[in-house]
UniProtKB/Swiss-Prot annotation:
Disruption phenotype: No effect on fertility or longevity but mutants display longer periods of daily activity than controls, reduced rest, enhanced sensitivity to mechanical stimuli when inactive and decreased rest rebound in response to rest deprivation. Impaired aversive olfactory memory due to excessive dopaminergic signaling. RNAi-mediated knockdown in neurons causes significant reduction in the sleep-like rest state with total daily resting periods decreased to about half of that of control flies. This is Sodium-dependent dopamine transporter. GO terms for cellular component: axon; neuronal cell body membrane; plasma membrane; presynaptic membrane. It comes from Drosophila melanogaster (Fruit fly). Na(+) 1 binds at residues 42, 45, 417, 420-421. Residues 14-24 have a biased composition (Basic and acidic residues).
Length: 631
């Protein structure tokens, strides 16, 4: 650190854990501000922005849904997003070390969020592998999901042209199939109430199946060869190869840290916007497109009086922004200390929400075209999730001139949307463990190779003929209630134990002005209520897991709850361990374990007769500090 308080790329003053005696360390920082912004945007903007938000907006009152969505975004989503970015930038460590320094009693929060990210990465990359498989399949003059004369097709298969000729709505009533309260996250959005990732029923009505539906379910997934989660069947080696390619891409993007991933995201984060723009222009030129957009945006303000609409809005906001996975904290820890994290939080949150809104025009312009072509209602083709991007949208693309081109860029968009979100989840784990265990940091390349090898081996279960059942189980339980509980404890630890006043001073020290009263009220009161609201409503509506007509056995649901509980239990388990291993009376132990690491170091130095500026780990230059500004 220079005399003026400037932080160089090579050396960043920062406090360490108790097992480290120095107060500064070598920490890599982003080579440019844009690298950080693109990484955060790439993580937050993922598949759910394309397949989830537009349908929610349509289902919950059209344009009126923007009212509860905007309120939940402002009072719950952005404050939590801002909080986690600020924590990461100020403490300059991954989740485990950060929480160990902030509130030692709640160090288990760090372990919990790392374990949640670990579970999610087991299955999230399978979605990317599906996208890659479709991408490879698109290199043909005739897209394979357009006809019914393939070996995987059944006599009930109907191509799109036959559907149009007979006016049979074989796409099916998707809104019925996907009538859910809280929907699929698939990394940034997770099932909360037993709703189904049903793709086998998509495209199925009155005994008929669309060609696109049979291609996905009978060829890509081969679900017809499995009876359930107890019958995974053989590994599909084409999918296993695609999954391997995905992990190789992830490895060579992350093995050197942010120096490599920060450059890769220039493509993976920006390419989807180019494709969305192209698809938007193309969609608006299709017949019937404005009918779809009308359904998407026409406001029905009576909908906002329904509790489930507000739950949908809150759930979408929370899981779309993605606090609690440790990703925001990890990415921000590589910022320069005086970076304006407040501006970054507002900018990236706005871009994330705007992307979701624009994606709605891309999706519903094509759904309007499908409804117009098939002679059915929008309700009969409007859906979300895998059924939208792997069945409905591909079927529509196949009818356009130059369909191969449209298919290639669409699935490349899905691939890149998934990849940079996967980068974030993996980096959260790597950074947290590297900061807590220095040996891992010194052998990062080997550790990342081992981590992705483990992911691949476990991911093979999702590449089997019954792998979708395993995938669906993880999607339901890996990061639903557990992430909500973890972030609830984050909000409590920061606001009520560490203290919003102290946290505000930390932010003032970084950016020159403290957060205003509004942010403090949100952190202290609104955010915890926001999280409890989502959690309690989800628990009330909980139903055992199903998929189409298949009901998961009791042992599968029990396994799912064990997975969910294994991460959350780290919070009390680590707290109990800390209480038992800390000397002193019970009251003294609580005092020590709720005292931030910096204060403990300050007290230790004062007791040793040493009083020095280094006892308070702040980086503000008093001569250049800015005056407080209320925001």
């Amino acid at each position: 650190m220079s005399p003026t308080g400037h932080i160089s790329k090579s050396k960043t003053p920062t406090p360490h854990d108790n097992d480290n005696n120095s107060i500064s360390d070598e920490r890599e920082t982003w080579s440019g501000k844009v690298d950080f912004l693109l990484s955060v945007i790439g993580f937050a903007v993922d598949l759910a922005n394309v397949w989830r938000f537009p349908y929610l907006c349509y289902k919950n009152g059209g344009g009126a849904f923007l009212v509860p969505y905007g309120i939940m975004l402002v009072v719950g989503g952005i404050p939590l997003f801002y909080m986690e970015l600020a924590l990461g930038q100020h403490n300059r460590k991954g989740a485990i070390t950060c929480w160990g320094r902030l509130v030692p009693l709640f160090k288990g929060i760090g372990y919990a969020v790392v374990l949640i990210a670990f579970y999610v990465d087991f299955y999230y990359n399978v979605i990317i592998a599906w996208s890659l498989r479709f991408f490879f399949a698109s290199f043909t003059n005739s897209l394979p999901w357009t006809s019914c004369n393939n070996i995987w097709n059944t006599p009930n298969c109907r191509p799109f042209e036959s559907q149009n000729a007979s006016r049979v709505p074989v796409i099916g009533n998707y809104s019925d199939l996907y009538a859910m309260g809280n929907q699929s996250l698939l990394y940034n959005e997770t099932y909360m109430n037993g709703s189904s990732l049903d793709t086998s029923a998509v495209g199925h009505v009155e005994g008929f199946q669309s060609a696109a539906s049979e291609y996905f379910n009978r060829y890509i997934l081969e679900l017809n060869r499995s009876e359930g989660i107890h019958d995974l069947g053989a590994i599909k080696w084409d999918m296993a190869l695609c999954l391997l390619i995905v992990y190789l891409i992830c490895y060579f993007s992350l093995w050197k840290g942010i120096s490599t991933s920060g450059k890769v995201v220039w493509f993976t984060a920006l390419f989807p916007y180019a494709v969305l723009l192209i698809l938007l222009i193309r969609g608006l030129t299709l017949p019937g497109s404005f009918l779809g957009i009308q359904y998407y945006l026409t406001p029905n303000f009576s909908a906002i009086y329904k509790a489930e609409v507000w739950v949908d809005a809150a759930t979408q906001v929370f899981f779309s922004l993605g606090p609690g996975f440790g990703v925001l904290l990890a990415y921000a820890s590589y910022n320069k200390y005086h970076n304006n994290v407040y501006k970054d939080a507002l900018l990236t949150s706005f871009i994330n929400s705007a992307t979701s809104f624009i994606a709605g025009f891309v999706i519903f312009s094509v759904l309007g075209y499908m409804a117009h072509t098939l002679g059915v209602r929008i309700e009969d083709v409007a859906t979300e999730g895998p059924g939208l991007v792997f069945v409905v949208y591909p079927a529509a693309i196949a009818t356009m001139p130059a369909s191969t081109f449209w298919a290639l860029i669409f699935f490349m968009m899905l691939l890149t949307l998934g990849l940079d979100s996967s980068f974030g989840g993996s980096e959260a784990i790597i950074t947290a463990l590297s900061d807590e265990f220095p040996k891992i940091k010194r052998n990062r390349e080997l550790f990342v190779a081992g981590l992705f090898s483990l992911y691949f081996v476990v991911g093979l279960a999702s590449c089997t003929q019954g792998g979708f059942y395993f995938f669906h189980l993880l999607d339901r339980y890996a990061a639903g209630y557990s992430i909500l509980v973890a972030v609830f404890f984050e909000a409590i630890a920061v606001s009520w134990i560490y203290g919003t006043n102290r946290f505000s001073e930390d932010i003032r020290d970084m950016i020159g002005f403290p957060p205003g009263r509004y942010w403090q009220v949100c952190w202290r009161f609104v955010a915890p209520i926001f999280l409890l609201f989502i959690t309690v409503y989800g628990l009330i509506g909980y139903e055992p897991l199903t998929y189409a007509d298949y009901v998961y056995p009791s042992w599968a649901n029990a396994l799912g709850w064990c997975i969910a509980g294994s991460s959350v239990v780290m919070i009390p388990a680590v707290a109990i361990f800390k209480l038992l291993s800390t000397p002193g009376s019970l009251r003294q132990r609580f005092t020590i374990l709720t005292t931030p690491w910096r204060d403990q170091q300050s007290m230790a130095m004062v007791l040793n007769g040493v009083t020095t500026e280094v006892t308070v780990v702040r980086l503000t230059d008093t001569e250049t500090a800015k005056e407080p500004v209320d925001v």
